[in-house]
Amino acid sequence: MSNDNNISNDLVGVNIFYTTNKEDTLISIARNHDISFADILSANDVNMDPWIPGENKKLLIPKSHILPFGKREGIIINIGDLRLYYFKDENSIENYPIGIGRSGWETPLGYAKIIKKKKDPVWIPPESVRKEDPSLPKVVAAGEDNPLGNRALYLSIPSYLIHGTNKPYGVGMKVSHGCIRLYPEDIEKLFNYVSEGVRVNIINQPIKAGWRNKKLYIEVHSLPEYVLEKSNKDIIKKSELYPLAYEIVQKAAGVNITVVDWNKVKEAVALSKGIPIEIMLVNK
């Protein structure tokens, strides 16, 4: 599929390759391709410094994604793959990498809606946040020191927002106080697309499965240790992903369950590369 925003199957986008330059960082490469550097770490069999990856390294840029299960309308925020999906209509979609709440400040699951849009928002740190960091002022004016960035979408869940950030490297990580952060350029796009009243569904699907061109795929996500806070206790172990993978694949395959190569499913879980992997038996 050549058009990243067109929906004709359960998958959108196409993976590409990139060869690093001397001045590159994984953070800059990720942002230039609208993914997170955690996506790059997961998708590639590399052990490199995100700040100095070196030159002439060929990297897979994971731009292909299986759409989450669920009604395809409004905004779906999947904390399982750290991505936000906005369904503009039944045929087109925008999707962006996100950062979410860390351990103890988990982003809540469930339905909400956008109740307010604000350019250059002022941040009023909640008392719970100020207890953690007493040096914070009661009000943070709009500007480069404001962690909300230059756009904010306020949710019907009290104190939770979809917003930009003044620390783009936090996109793709679980480091916030529960809000959903996007790259500055992505929140500007989303801000212009959506209106007040748009439905938001926050889900947790670290494993997704779906069809493209009569081929069945699985996509398994497990965050690299590098991007996790040491206090994170809510990370699902890979051993716990196997039964979930079987359940998800069975749901996606339906009556075509006999075409599934379960060894490929097991391997996909073990690798957890965060990219769609075809899981059909040969000649099926």
Regions found by a protein language model. Give the residues of each.
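Structured segments of extracytoplasmic/periplasmic soluble domains
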Residues: N32-S36, A43-V46, P62, F87, ...
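Flexible, glycine-rich surface segments
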Residues: L155-P206
